[in-house]
Amino acid sequence: MVTSTIKDVQDQLKLTEYDLLLIGDGSGTTIDQSSGWSCFYFDKNKFFYTILKGGCSFGTNNFAELAPYFNALWFDLYKQGNVLKMDRKVQIVSDSEITVKCGNKIYSRNCNLPLWSGINWLESIGYKLTWNHVNRNTNHISKLCDRIAGETRKMFLTNQTDSGMI
């Protein structure tokens, strides 16, 4: 099932050359509300895949849409032994047009600067990122990531703290 789904995404976007495929989604609203994210991580060379997810008690939707890729790249660097021995070609798939345009440097990377700074550093050590836009829920993996991101966000909603002044 997973291999046919990966092939569907490869065919949909005409992806051929890559070492790592990341398909993710985020769920958030405003900075004072919880956010969640999910990312399908596929290392083509090792034929290893997993779903990464996370969230926090704050975060805008744009923050949540970017978080899966920063975290997946950080995870990948750890899996590589914290050192890249050669360039690593990464295909990133997102339904966030803003995230993709910032990733491809059509828009500036000034919003969510801490995450973009980390991504910039990862690019400087050899990650070659290609950002691809897909419409929302147009493949099974994106649908799965959308659902997991929303569920993860809800986990943090129940733990929301009072942000009032003391």
Question: Model-found features: residue ranges?
Answer:
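RNase H catalytic domain
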Residues: 27-31, 70-146, 153-155
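Short C-terminal domain-edge/linker segments immediately following a structured domain
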Residues: 51-55, 121-126, 161-165
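RNase H-like nuclease fold core
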Residues: 2-67, 71-75, 79-81
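Glycine-rich loops and low-complexity Gly/Arg-rich segments
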Residues: 46-49, 63-66, 115-119, 155-159
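Charged phosphate-binding loop/patch that engages nucleotide di/tri-phosphates or the phosphate backbone
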Residues: 147-166
